[in-house]
């Protein structure tokens, strides 16, 4: 259910874009992201920081898009969010409090150096996505950018998640692999 909620704003953004335009889609994205926060809180009694940051960014950039009737703002939102994720991961690693380890370290037990590899891998991924988004958003037609945002970035994130899980599993001590397989 939680994963479905994560995709709700993206699906609504895409559907409204296809039916109307980028401005209606931006407004729908703001509303859908707010709805996502409300439903998540009602179901789980907490809101993750990532969802809150995303909501703030969607609201700010979506509102700017609507007020100035300029799609550049909603396009920049993707780059800014990815850049913030990269910065947060990099800083957490540099101060020896890796976010990914704190989120996943109880389930996936690996050495700190492996968590560092994974963190820097994701920092690189987010920076790459931020830069590619700039290119696609401002060099190609709007419809191409919308498809890239919805399908391309989602697929890339999924592939990188699978690669990360495989890498973590491969570097996990055998006793933890057995324990994980028995769950």
From Swiss-Prot:
Source organism superkingdom: Bacteria
Chief localization: membrane
GO CC aspect terms: plasma membrane
Pfam families linked to this entry: IspA (PF04279)
Stretches that traverse the bilayer: 10-30, 50-70, 72-92, 118-138, 148-168
Stretches assigned to coiled coil: none
InterPro entries: YciB (IPR006008)
Topological category with respect to the lipid bilayer: Multi-pass membrane protein
Record key words, sorted: Cell inner membrane, Cell membrane, Membrane, Transmembrane, Transmembrane helix
Subcellular location: Cell inner membrane
Function of the protein: Plays a role in cell envelope biogenesis, maintenance of cell envelope integrity and membrane homeostasis.
HAMAP family assigned: YciB
Entry's family note: Belongs to the YciB family.
Protein name as it appears in the record: Inner membrane-spanning protein YciB
Native source organism of the sequence: Shewanella sediminis (strain HAW-EB3)
């Amino acid at each position: 259910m939680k994963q479905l909620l994560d995709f709700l704003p993206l699906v609504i953004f895409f559907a409204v874009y296809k039916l109307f335009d980028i401005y209606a889609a931006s407004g729908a994205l703001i509303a859908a992201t707010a709805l996502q926060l409300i439903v998540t809180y009602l179901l789980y009694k907490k809101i993750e920081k990532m969802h809150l940051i995303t909501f703030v960014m969607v609201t700010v950039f979506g509102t700017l898009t609507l007020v100035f009737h300029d799609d550049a703002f909603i396009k920049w939102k993707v780059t800014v969010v990815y850049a913030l994720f990269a910065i947060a991961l990099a800083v957490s690693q540099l101060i020896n409090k890796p976010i990914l380890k704190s989120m996943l370290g109880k389930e996936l037990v690996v050495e700190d150096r492996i968590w560092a590899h994974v963190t820097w891998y994701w920092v690189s991924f987010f920076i790459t996505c931020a830069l590619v988004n700039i290119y696609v958003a401002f060099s190609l037609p709007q419809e191409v950018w919308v498809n890239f945002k919805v399908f391309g970035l989602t697929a890339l994130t999924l592939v990188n998640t699978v690669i990360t899980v495989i890498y973590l599993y491969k570097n996990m001590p055998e006793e933890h692999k057995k324990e994980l397989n028995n769950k």
